Amino acid sequence: MSPPGSAAGESAAGGGGGGGGPGVSEELTAAAAAAAADEGPAREEQRPIQPSFTKSLCRESHWKCLLLSLLMYGCLGAVAWCHVTTVTRLTFSSAYQGNSLMYHDSPCSNGYVYIPLAFLLMLYAVYLVECWHCQARHELQHRVDVSSVRERVGRMQQATPCIWWKAISYHYVRRTRQVTRYRNGDAYTTTQVYHERVNTHVAEAEFDYARCGVRDVSKTLVGLEGAPATRLRFTKCFSFASVEAENAYLCQRARFFAENEGLDDYMEAREGMHLKNVDFREFMVAFPDPARPPWYACSSAFWAAALLTLSWPLRVLAEYRTAYAHYHVEKLFGLEGPGSASSAGGGLSPSDELLPPLTHRLPRVNTVDSTELEWHIRSNQQLVPSYSEAVLMDLAGLGTRCGGAGGGYAPSCRYGGVGGPGAAGVAPYRRSCEHCQRAVSSSSIFSRSALSICASPRAGPGPGGGAGCGGSRFSLGRLYGSRRSCLWRSRSGSVNEASCPTEQTRLSSQASMGDDEDDDEEEAGPPPPYHDALYFPVLIVHRQEGCLGHSHRPLHRHGSCVETSL
């Protein structure tokens, strides 16, 4: 029976002449999509590991039990040797008028057999005590069934994390006390000086992640029914999906400890993470049916084997038949993907849109500088990109933004108008070409004239440029200065579009001093600033044209070919 609200909705939809059917289906589809979005991406599966015999020995060797067992076996061997072995003895007795008497007897007949027996009894007592300690540890283990483990894992995944910091300010106070000492039977009193720790201030704080958000990225624990027993270990950890979330964590942490650092002579810093409203247990053992465990896990079988000095083989068998699983409860702070902070506050900047998406999470590390440097190198938000990163940038979206700016001046359209119609026509051609490989260079700063020539849709003939499909050559950047000529040169080929850029890149080192002077005259003005280095054009090298049919020596770099005349 449906609730009144649902019934009213159905009657209203029916009165509308059947027009509410598609609306209801759309609402159901939207609700299902929202539920799927709430569930998040599919989790990875984790299964318990069944160890081999050697790994089970290395994991838990029980060396004390093994050593005591070997010593007891040695004592039993000595007693058995005393009863089995016979030696020939020669004695002289006055009853036989001074004649010698030879007979066979045990080597331990004179009471030597009691020595290994005493050692055996002592070792057996120590052995039973060690077995009692082992059984007590097993009894203290938290034994649960498989369904309880699943429920506990689900609660830990849904639990709210709390990263806490604690600062304890303290100092030491010099105190004295009277103690009584004894020397040569005489008692005398002396003064002892000691230092006592005094805590003066205790402060606690938590990480406020309301702005960056958090979600659980733990794996799904499956396959617990396949093993007779599974030993589980749970650990808690956290990571960051964006540098903004990590910077927020580090800033709050540094601010908290900085506020409490100078309150006293010393400060003890503690930090950790706990899950709210969850009884966290690090170790537990899961059975399909805890009321009926395997025979080797019963206490009666354990004590029977212990009395027969067979406790160590039983323990090895139990370790071999027990599966192990180390489960990490991981919480991810921050939103996945590039520009999490900017997406929450507004649109992306042009430089952020050109950056590749973030594909790896940033784990929590102890060193702050290395994490920030790794992020800056990866995202390239504050460092000037290299040539290989500049050629991978998508200029089509940049050209669209520059073309739609109208007559106004845009910073991204400087140095030759990268977003002009020529660049818009070049981008589809580059995407459709399957044989093109982008050239790689670690240091190249483009000049103003080179960029204007490259971005010009229809440059006239002259020393600095030519027709769209002509054979002009121009300098894009200087690597070693004016005295050592090593220039990137490009020669355009025949393509379908008239405004296409060059299709072959060559590295020439045979320029003379006259060429250097011409290049110096051509490079009028200083190089572009760092901000404009993000909008450099793309150089393309054809694998077939650049590698075959030339007498120069080819240089291969990551699948592409750059000609050089060494």
Swiss-Prot record:
Primary location group: membrane
Region ranges (Disordered): 1-25, 495-529
Compositional bias (Acidic residues): 514-524
Record-annotated membrane-spanning stretches: 65-85, 112-132
Keyword terms, alphabetized: Membrane, Transmembrane, Transmembrane helix
Record keyword Transmembrane helix present: yes
Keyword Phosphoprotein: no
Superkingdom per UniProt: Eukaryota
GO cellular component: a single term: membrane
Biased composition annotated in UniProt, kind: Polar residues: 495-512
UniProt family annotation: Belongs to the TMEM151 family.
PANTHER family named among the record's database cross-references: TRANSMEMBRANE PROTEIN 151 HOMOLOG, TRANSMEMBRANE PROTEIN 151B
Name of protein: Transmembrane protein 151B
